[in-house]
Each structure stands twice: as structure tokens, then as C-alpha cells.
Amino acid sequence: MSDLKAAALRALKLMDLTTLNDNDTDEAVIALCKNAKTAVGNTAAVCIYPRFIPIAKKTLREQGTPEVRIATVTNFPHGNDDIEIAVAETKAAVAYGADEVDVVFPYRALIAGDETTGFELVKQCKEACGDVLLKVIIETGELKEEALIKKASQICIEAGANFIKTSTGKVPVNATPEYARMMLEVIRDMDVAKTVGFKPAGGVRTAEDAQAYLAMADEILGDDWADNMHYRFGASSLLTNLLNTLEVTEETADPSAY
């Protein structure tokens, strides 16, 4: 198997296959769940709005892939600084049956110099999650500066985040290799690689993209680190392109897709 094919297969099994469109329907979510099961293995998770968790759970169970995890989003995509609402949404997501919650960090508060709100929001959302995995979206494309991206990553980790995630996919600039490197370096420098994972989201579209991101993780945190409890790709169109690289399909995805 070529290096690119090996990377494509590895990336496929690390995907949070995502649909977070305002016009999502039960049918769209059922189709997403069916796509999570492929001839070469399953994606790690599907990522959907909370109201679709029951239909996703049913579909995954009926198709014989109950191990595909269900991720959902809270405080999304705005990243407001109302802790009470973020916690209430997170509790509701857990009650719906989410295995993982991706919450948006109050990044505008941090830009304005407020570090406390973000810490408290993440801490209380993690308490609401219990054993449910909490991924925190710091919105790198809005923070922009290395100092802010590293500070947000540190705050999330100190407050108990299980993963730090680049982006919502709803702003002009989402994951980039530069932002990924900054966040991975924080995980390394804080010596939390055993307990904290990383998720680039939005902008990872091809097998070559995924290969480059995984090579970076291997370089910074070691070859065995990026397993499905420490690394995820948040994407939708990536799956079609990975399957194309693996010669399972001849399709390629719309280059503008998430």
C-alpha cells in the first residue's frame, strides 16, 4: 500500500463525519450515518445537531455499527459568553445520548482580554458531560494570533477539555496547518498528550491534506499518538476523496465543501 493510501485509511478511521447545515433533515442524517460505514472501515464518529441524535443512534444500531460515536455541538457556532446557556445546551446534548460534545469557546471574550469566562465555561461544560468526551472549539481563524491561539488552548486544557478543536467550519478561515501546529505544540509543552486530543475541522479536504496533518502530529507527539481517542478530522467532503484515493469510489467531492 502506498504511503498516501495508508494515510487515507488512517484518516478515514479518525473522521468525525459531519453535517451541520441549517436545513439538515432526518433523511440527511440517515444518509450521513450510512456513509460512515464504508467498505474499508468506519469513521470514528458522526457529528450532527442535537435534535438528530435519536435518529442517528437508531440508524447506526440498525446498520450494525453501534461503535460509531455520536458527536454533537453546543454554544454553536457563535461562541457566546453565556455560561448558563452553554451548560444547559451541553446537559441537554448528554441527555439526548451524545457520546461527545463539541462546544464553542467564548473566543471573543478572550480577544477582549477575559480569560476567566472561557475557563469557567469549559470547566462547567465538562462537569455537565461527566464521562462524555468534551471537545472545545477555539475558532482559530477568528483568534488569528499565535499568542491567543495558544492561550485559548491552554485555558481549555486547564479547564478539563478532552480535545481542543480548531474551528466551527462557519467562519471564513477554518483549520490551517499553521494553527494545527500551534495547538499540537501546546499539548506537547503542557505534557498532556496522554489525556488531550486534537481535532482540525473545516479545510481538510483531500488525502494529501490529511496525510500532511497526520505527519505533523507524528512529528510533534510521536508516531502512535494520533489514534481515534486523541485525533479526529472534522469534515464531510474529505470522506469521498479518501475513498477515491483508496479506489473504493471514482467520485471526488465538491472542492468548496466542508
Curated annotation (Swiss-Prot):
Q: In which pathway does it act?
A: Carbohydrate degradation; 2-deoxy-D-ribose 1-phosphate degradation; D-glyceraldehyde 3-phosphate and acetaldehyde from 2-deoxy-alpha-D-ribose 1-phosphate: step 2/2
Tell me the enzyme class: lyase
Location of the active site:
102, 165, 199
- The domain of life for this entry's organism is Bacteria
Which is an annotated GO molecular function term of this record? deoxyribose-phosphate aldolase activity
Q: Tell me the compartments it is located in.
A: Cytoplasm
**EC number(s)?**
4.1.2.4
Q: Reply yes or no: does the keyword Cytoplasm apply.
A: yes
**Cellular component terms, GO, for this chain's entry?**
cytoplasm
Role, per record: Catalyzes a reversible aldol reaction between acetaldehyde and D-glyceraldehyde 3-phosphate to generate 2-deoxy-D-ribose 5-phosphate.
Q: What is this protein called?
A: Deoxyribose-phosphate aldolase
- Identify the gene encoding this protein: deoC
